[in-house]
Amino acid sequence: MTTVLIDYDSGNLHSAQKAFERMAAETGAGAVVVTSDPDAVRAADRIVLPGDGAFPHCRAQLFGVSGLADAIVEAVEADAKPFMGICVGMQMMAKRGFEYQETPGFGWIDGEIHKITPSDPTLPVPHMGWNDLVIERDHPVRSPDRSSPCAARAGTIW
């Protein structure tokens, strides 16, 4: 089994690569390959599209790599391969985004991506830094041995 992380010169590729390599090593999930080669995308078993930055810029970068977007669409729509988008990679699954300008997405999710405008203009978006997490209810994703969880993440919106 091969998981490809698509390299289209958009941001958080290195951290995503390290996370998937660790997951693969711990679970035996197979090879993790970083690529911008459309043929490697077609040959992969699973596809991950990371992304960091503005929706229109990421889309332009992705569609600027010859054949790459077509290979993703073919793998997902025709071959039904599992696909995961991270950050802007996830946003591009929607019909369109409205960050700075209207920009088409893949259209796999019937939705639109709009920039968040906080009620307090002094609040930064995206939020970056350390925060204490308040657990409202148990969830299988949360490890039961963490009594005082906190998280650091750049650009995560919870």
How would you name each of these model-derived features?
Residues M1-F83, V88, Q101, D110-P124:
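N-terminal beta1-alpha1 cap of cysteine-dependent amidohydrolase-like domains
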Residues K95-W158:
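Pocket-forming structural segment of enzyme catalytic cores
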